[in-house]
């Protein structure tokens, strides 16, 4: 991620309130990620490299560098619970998290995350993982090694 002061600020579409937009691709230092990924691949030090994040499939250059693209689908209510637990652990209040989630996150999710999930090779159920689906993913990864 970029430093907090370098991240974009967005206005909520309905209320016009300004929020630091951590759900926008410009939040991520994509050039650094691309360089780090290339360096890790070229080093030969790693058999498997996992790139995780809600914007991973959005950038075409990053997608093209991945051998396997997975998207983990979660219901909106599960996403907010996970976000609340994580962000409250970072010291944010319930109201701070709930406000940005209600006012900005759904729009960014539709714009960048939902629209890019179709770039995945597999879409997995994040609410109820399937042992068969996980076995298929593991089998594919092992076939590349």
Where are these regions (language model features)?
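Residue-level signal for inorganic ion chemistry
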Residues: 33, 70, 120
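Conserved nucleotide-sensing/catalytic segment adjacent to the nucleotide-binding pocket
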Residues: 1-51
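ATP-dependent NMP and nucleoside kinases share a basic, alpha-helical "lid"
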Residues: 51-90
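NTP-dependent small-molecule kinase module
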Residues: 44-46, 85-89, 107-145
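An accessory alpha-helical subdomain
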Residues: 94-104, 132
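Conserved protein kinase catalytic core
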Residues: 2-6, 58-59, 79, 133
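Conserved catalytic network of the ASCE P-loop NTPase/AAA+ motor domain
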Residues: 39-44, 61-65, 115-116
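Short gly/ser/thr-rich secondary-structure transition/capping motifs
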Residues: 49-54, 103-107
């Amino acid at each position: 991620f970029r430093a907090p002061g370098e991240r974009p600020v967005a206005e909520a579409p309905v209320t016009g309130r300004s929020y630091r937009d951590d759900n926008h691709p410009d939040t991520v230092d994509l050039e650094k990620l691309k360089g780090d990924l290339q360096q890790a691949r070229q080093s030969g030090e790693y058999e498997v490299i996992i790139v995780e994040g809600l914007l991973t499939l959005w950038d075409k250059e990053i997608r093209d560098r991945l051998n396997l693209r997975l998207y983990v689908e979660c219901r909106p209510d599960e996403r907010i619970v996970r976000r609340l637990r994580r962000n409250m652990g970072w010291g944010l209040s319930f109201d701070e998290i709930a406000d940005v989630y209600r006012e900005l996150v759904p729009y960014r999710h539709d714009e960048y995350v939902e629209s890019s999930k179709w770039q995945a090779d597999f879409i997995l159920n994040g609410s109820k993982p399937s042992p068969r689906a996980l076995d298929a993913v593991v089998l594919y990864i092992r076939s590349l090694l």
